[in-house]
């Protein structure tokens, strides 16, 4: 599947501190693993039944920061993202709206691509739909059955295949939740703890046997379709190997999705960890209320841009808070971001900055971003520069160019 056009990202001179990110599994901020070749990064993509809201955007803008920082530091990045284009929520939305589920998925994927292009997000090298990865999933399910990490229901009308969550002793290391919390999230987030015939209530679906009216693919274990978690396991490991550097997504994916994606890959490939870093972004609320489809209070990127709000301001509004924190989107957040953008542009156009001052500023911004993406501190450093810049004096064009290049290369904001 094709992604979207890559934005022009300028080369940024100068040295960069090593990037350090919080790892959910180890509960610590630690250096990102930089292999001799490329940094492998996998970020879970959308289920295409609704257009890109700010919760989605905040996640992909966070990992765009990581992508940009690593590239500006001279590292290659192999970025992979999936699209869950076969899943129950997609079918349910299509049935509700009286449309074909594939047509709905295609339309929402197209809108997502458009939003990502507008926001100047660097596209993944591999942008893979679940339907494109069926053979990979079948291969991994077969491997899990072979090693004893999975089983097929016997004597059931629908002989689904499940992963035995007790197979690996490290299960639970990624999320660090206790058994009770895992059981609650499993039930709330797409699990089926009461399914008859399972060995354990928390065993996760790997292959769903065909039901009337659902799409199906042939497999050695009967016609059906993939479970949710194993799609990401197969797509990630088949392109990045295991372990790879960064597994990312929203904090709501911490469990069960990322825990099971990891355990499937680890059991199939005989490794202790699927990823060195598990990085999760906070949730975005609207005016103090959690943003959700059920509440009808989603803020869509496409509607903001259609109303005339500049994508660069949307980026700055998202970056005003720390990526790991749950935070609010309000009209004031957007207005402040637009004011910030205008003040930076004014400082570049009319202010005076020496080359040494510019390089010190860029180093400061890089240092804040290297410290677990401390965007608030990075933006404040730029605010201080803009406020302190004397207007009306003859500026150093090289200094202005260096600041402008850094803001574009690191933050994706074109001044």
UniProtKB/Swiss-Prot annotation:
GO CC annotation, single: cytosol
Motif ('ERGGDP' region): 188-193
Any Gene Ontology biological process: mycothiol biosynthetic process
CDD domains to which the protein is assigned, alphabetical: CysRS_core
Keywords: ATP-binding, Ligase, Metal-binding, Nucleotide-binding, Zinc
Location of the motif 'KMSKS' region: 290-294
Catalytic activity: 1D-myo-inositol 2-amino-2-deoxy-alpha-D-glucopyranoside + L-cysteine + ATP = 1D-myo-inositol 2-(L-cysteinylamino)-2-deoxy-alpha-D-glucopyranoside + AMP + diphosphate + H(+)
GO molecular function, one term: ATP binding
Disulfide cross-links: none
Pfam family, one: tRNA-synt_1e
Binding of Zn(2+), residues: 44, 232, 257
Enzyme class, broadest EC rank: ligase
Cofactor comment text: Binds 1 zinc ion per subunit.
Its EC number(s): 6.3.1.13
Binding residues for L-cysteinyl-5'-AMP: 44-47, 59, 82-84, 228, 250-252, 284
Cofactor: Zn(2+)
InterPro entries linked to this entry: Cys-tRNA/MSH_ligase (IPR024909), Mycothiol_ligase_MshC (IPR017812), Rossmann-like_a/b/a_fold (IPR014729), tRNA-synt_1_cat_dom (IPR032678)
Span(s) of short sequence motif 'HIGH' region: 46-56
Chain's role: Catalyzes the ATP-dependent condensation of GlcN-Ins and L-cysteine to form L-Cys-GlcN-Ins.
Subunit structure: Monomer.
Family of this protein: Belongs to the class-I aminoacyl-tRNA synthetase family. MshC subfamily.
UniProt name for this protein: L-cysteine:1D-myo-inositol 2-amino-2-deoxy-alpha-D-glucopyranoside ligase 2
